[in-house]
Every structure is written in C-alpha cells, then in structure tokens.
C-alpha cells in the first residue's frame, strides 16, 4: 500500500512539473509586445524602464534605440515581435524619456553614455544594436565610444554627424506638429510617411499598431525633454563629421527613398563610410520606411543578424 502511495505521489510530482513547463512554454509563445511586462533597473540613481521580448532565445540580445519623442509605446509591435521570434530584443526609456525620470541629455554623446550604462547594468558584455532616427545617431556614438560592446548594428532612418539636412529636423518637427494640431492627426503621419495613398494607408496602419497595447502603457514624453532632444539633434546636424572608417562591425543601413527628416543621401553616405556595411532603400517610402515595409525589414534584419 505504501509503495502504491509513493508511486502516486511521484506521478503527481512529475505531472505537476510537466504542467508547469507547458504553462511556461505557453506564456512564452503568447508573449507579444502588446502584453509584455515593463521592468526597471536602478543605475546610479536613475531608474531605467524597459521591456524585454524573446528572452527564451539564446545568443546576443538586440537593443532597440528609438526616435525623437519616442517612449516604449512608440516601438512598432510588428518589428519587436518579428525580431523576438529569433532574438531577445530590449527597448527602453533613456534618461528623461517616458517612465525614466531625469533630464534628457543635450548631446548625442551623453545619450550614448546613458544607453551603455543601461546595457552594462543588465549584465551584457556584447549586444547588437537596432537604432532608428535619433536611435541611429546614438548607435553610431556607442560604436565609436565602446566598439567592443557591439557585435552588429542596424542603422535605420538615420545619418552621420553633420549629415545633409539633419540640422533642419527641429524646424520640420515643429511645422508638422502644428500641421497635426490643425488637421487633428498625429504628427508622425507627416513626419514618417509620404502624402500619397500608400503613405497615408501605411501611416494609419502604423498608428493603429501603436495603440494595440491597452494596459500598462508608458508615460508620455515631457515637452521640456523633447526640446532637449531636439537641441541634441540640431547639434548633431552641425557637428563635424566623425571618422566612421574605424567602425569594423557589420552594419546594415536602411531608409525610405523620400525621407524628409533625415534625407536618404545620408543613408548612402553611411554605407560608403562604413566599410563592412549593407544598404536597403525602400521605394515610395519616407522616414518611417521600416514601418511601412515592416515585414520585409524584419526578414532582412533577421537574415543580417544570422550571418
């Protein structure tokens, strides 16, 4: 009788463990950017907030650095979920952005230092970078400041220091914010997409995706920190060119062919100045070309990261 009880007990334990493993696997398979939890880590008195997808994937994580005025809620879910199928991908609010308190730095170099501090706080010694727009500026600085930290980088909708038209981002941003107020549209409709049928449709789809997350949304960007970001971008546009030939890592650069914010000429410039680079230019697309062509971009990004 005791043996029977012991066998039943062992079977119960085994079944419980199996059920727990299945439950854990199901949670992983259903985890998307729509429902992934927001975490935080304290570094030097600053509490950095972040979201991590694809944590079950082995290998080097991808750190996503986003655009001007962007909190974690401005990450495109299709790109985040797409990359997370094969890699761990982490987005975060840098200092003064969204839920992360403090003053946003007024230089790209300082923003890069903050990003590196965050990456090291998570315990990573090697990462891949995916930077869009302002995030692409920051990614370049990280590559130059601490090259040993980076395995590969993807630079999208971005340009080098002193690049063509970058000094005009502040003016373009304010104009399109005003356009948005008068038309009752999100300014990204104008900033990121062409004003033809393809662009308008892509803008609507993109903005709808940004609203898929209903609970535990991020805090809004404060105007004063938006202004500080714009000051940093303006300074980047006026800055002397950097020596990008010292970047030895594989780099993928991508943009739309009609980018009003960071003209596509900067994309070609990056690809020429970074020796080990590949380039993708999306036709009939603006600054948000990777959002308009999100499926194609994810395929290209995964292929690049897998090489």
Regions found by a protein language model. Give the residues of each.
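Short glycine-enriched nucleophile-adjacent loop
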Residues: 136-147, 153
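Conserved HGGG/HGGXW glycine-rich cap/lid loop of the alpha/beta-hydrolase fold
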Residues: 46-101
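Catalytic histidine-centered segment of alpha/beta-hydrolase-like enzymes
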Residues: 285-298
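Conserved alpha/beta-hydrolase catalytic His-Asp/Glu region
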Residues: 186-230, 234-238, 243
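Active-site loop/oxyanion-hole signature of alpha/beta-hydrolase fold enzymes
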Residues: 94-130
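Flexible "cap/lid" loop of the alpha/beta hydrolase fold
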Residues: 144, 152-182
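Conserved alpha/beta-hydrolase "acid-adjacent" motif
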Residues: 260-266
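Short beta-strand/loop motif that positions the catalytic acidic residue
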Residues: 247, 253-255, 259
